[in-house]
Curated annotation (Swiss-Prot):
Pathway: Protein modification; protein ubiquitination. One of its GO terms (molecular function) is ubiquitin protein ligase activity. The gene is RNF125. It comes from Macaca fascicularis. Its EC number is 2.3.2.27. It is found in: Golgi apparatus membrane. Zn(2+) 1 binds at residues 37, 40, 57, 60. One of its GO terms (biological process) is protein polyubiquitination. SUPFAM superfamilies: RING/U-box. Keywords: Adaptive immunity, Golgi apparatus, Immunity, Lipoprotein, Membrane, Metal-binding, Myristate, Transferase, Ubl conjugation, Ubl conjugation pathway, Zinc, Zinc-finger. This is E3 ubiquitin-protein ligase RNF125. It comes from the Eukaryota. PANTHER family: E3 UBIQUITIN-PROTEIN LIGASE RNF125, ZINC FINGER, RING/FYVE/PHD-TYPE.
Length: 232
């Protein structure tokens, strides 16, 4: 991985880092077990893993890619997209706790960004926390031509266009350089869920997924045993 979850995480942050990040820039190397984003140097928020294996906040990597011609801010590898949800990291953050560096309150890492938004000591020292790229990209719904934030498109389609079967182009694919905005007939919602929903942990119960995987392995083992028994 290439946030501070990477073993080579001692590189400095880009100029867009937050005030607190600028203060930390002299640190020799952040630990491998840290859950800090290598762009803003705050605790990861909605972590995303890029194709080159690095992990960043979703808003940080989105802004960085648009400002740096679609290259990884850490290793400069070309990235065709923001990446995929780092669900393993998000899951670990829900069970890890850390004291706020300013007020010393013990906070779950998954809630740390929400905490420092209201932490008066943090605000007094650095000002209100500003996420990179807080203004979401805009797109047009291909069914009704309504202008929406990209984050709102999926919910909008599920609410208003679930029964639509007209072939349409994906408006989010059009925002990505070199991406082919394929035409979808009756499956745009599924495409958005698979390709453009970065926070599966908001919609999926990890325990259910783990149980399903265990059942699948057991079923496969039983099937192999039966096949071997029949063969003999």
């Amino acid at each position: 991985m290439g946030s501070v979850l990477s073993s080579d995480s001692g590189k400095s942050a880009p100029p867009s880092a937050t005030p607190r990040a600028l203060e930390r820039r002299g640190d020799p190397e952040l630990p491998v077990t840290s859950f800090d984003c290598a762009v803003c140097l705050e605790v990861l928020h909605q972590p995303v893993r890029t194709r080159c294996g690095h992990v960043f906040c979703r808003s940080c990597i989105a802004t960085s890619l648009k400002n740096n011609k679609w290259t990884c801010p850490y290793c400069r590898a070309y990235l065709p997209s923001e990446g995929v949800p780092a669900t393993d990291v998000a899951k670990r953050m829900k069970s890890e706790y850390k004291n706020c560096a300013e007020c010393d309150t013990l906070v779950c890492l998954g809630e740390m960004r929400a905490h420092i938004r209201t932490c008066q000591k943090y605000i007094d020292k650095y000002g209100p926390l500003q996420e990179l790229g807080e203004t979401a990209a805009r797109c047009v719904c291909p069914f009704c031509q309504r202008e929406l934030d990209e984050d709102s498109l999926l919910d909008h389609c599920i609410t208003h266009h679930r029964s639509e079967r007209r072939p349409v182009f994906c408006p989010l694919c059009r925002l990505i350089p070199d991406e082919n905005p394929s035409s979808f007939s009756g499956s745009l919602i599924r495409h958005l869920q698979v390709s453009h929903t970065l926070f599966y942990d908001d919609f999926i119960d990890f325990n259910i997924i783990e149980e399903a995987l265990i059942r699948r392995v057991l079923d496969r083992s039983l099937l192999e045993y039966v096949n071997q028994s029949n063969a003999t």
